[in-house]
Amino acid sequence: MGPAGLFAALELARAGLKPVILERGSNVDVRRRKVDHFWQTGELDPECNVQFGEGGAGTFSDGKLNTMVKDPSGRNRKVLECFVAHGAPEEILYMQKPHIGTDKLREVVRSIREEILALGATVHFDTRFVRLLLQGDRICGVEYEQAGRISQMACEAVILATGHSARDTFIELKEQGVVMQPKAFAVGVRMEHPQEMIGLSQYGEAAKILPPASYKLTNTTSDGRGVYSFCMCPGGQVVNASSECGRLVVNGMSEYARDGANANSAIVVTVGPEDFGEGLFDGMQFQRRLEQAAYEQGQGRIPVQLLGDFLQNRESTALGEV
């Protein structure tokens, strides 16, 4: 139940309907305990983690928002106002780069769910969508798994808000004849610096009295490929965001205060079918190969390397300032 599913359910419930929401992960409170356990022990729950659970991947990310000032329909403003009504800082309504923070976002997500339930909707956590039930060329229900049991639910309309990590769902949908096509995506590394360094670089001596500084970088390589920074997290941390056993993914997050010692940002490049193959799931398999290599390189932990060593393709023997 990421942002797409959450707001679809909210709009339907506000319109007087009673949607039934299936979320493969746990509610935000149980999910937080499971994620903390994973970070402390390395024991991954593939059904409830940084990717799956109430709020989606964003619950354990930075809580950054887009302003979409050119949004002609006003939908984005409505979303921001909804966040504020459910406990987000009012400043997100006017800040150039609005930010809720991981700590506050959990409370906001819980509050939105409570409104959805109060309007008559039903939410089933720890419940995995398995496949569509079809009668001819029409949907007549869904099959789902809950507590190890397969059940069915009749319905005439389904909104599949899968996010990007439910790979088993994509495979099942293909087998059922759902039309899909591969698309480009970004892949890269997380760069980490002392926040004080970024502040001095951006603000000089004024960094002492200004909010934590961020940065945005772009570059076009000699072969025309774009490289850019993404999801810069001032005063944040790099976290293990894996959702499949034996594979490793990282993400960055900041809490509302952004008062951590380090800053981090993704440095990514866009890749497409010309890089990983034209097959429908070639991009997905490309991701899995990278994730497995990262897992093996770090023996299940996040592999860390100095930037200079990374650029020279050599192993790091010591850490830097972070």
Each model region followed by its residue ranges:
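Residues forming the flavin
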Residues: 1-322
